């Protein structure tokens, strides 16, 4: 799944907050829930407009970014 098909950033949707495409669910909410100890299945129950494929693809993409040899680019992007 292409990242652009996974995440939408649109100023007309939640003021440009990155959301799961086709939803109004902020991407950050998945990480917030997991950090709070909520399981992926519970998150999906709370946000039925997010598909399991979307959530897993996002987590896999984040993992690849954080374990990539190009992590310096990530550091620069969030600086």
Predicted features by range, described:
Residues 1-25:
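N-terminal first-folded block
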Residues 17-19, 25-27, 71-79:
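Short, surface-exposed, charge-dense and proline/glycine-enriched linear segments
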Residues 18-20, 25-61:
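Amphipathic, hydrophobic secondary-structure cores in small proteins
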Residues 50-78:
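C-terminal structural segments of small proteins and small subunits
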């Amino acid at each position: 799944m292409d990242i652009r098909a996974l995440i939408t950033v649109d100023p007309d949707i939640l003021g440009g907050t990155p959301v799961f495409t086709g939803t109004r669910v902020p991407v950050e909410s998945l990480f917030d829930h997991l950090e709070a100890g909520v399981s992926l299945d519970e998150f999906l129950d709370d946000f039925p407009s997010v598909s399991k494929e979307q959530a897993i693809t996002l987590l896999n993409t984040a993992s690849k970014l954080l374990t990539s040899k190009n992590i310096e680019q990530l550091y620069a992007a969030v600086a």
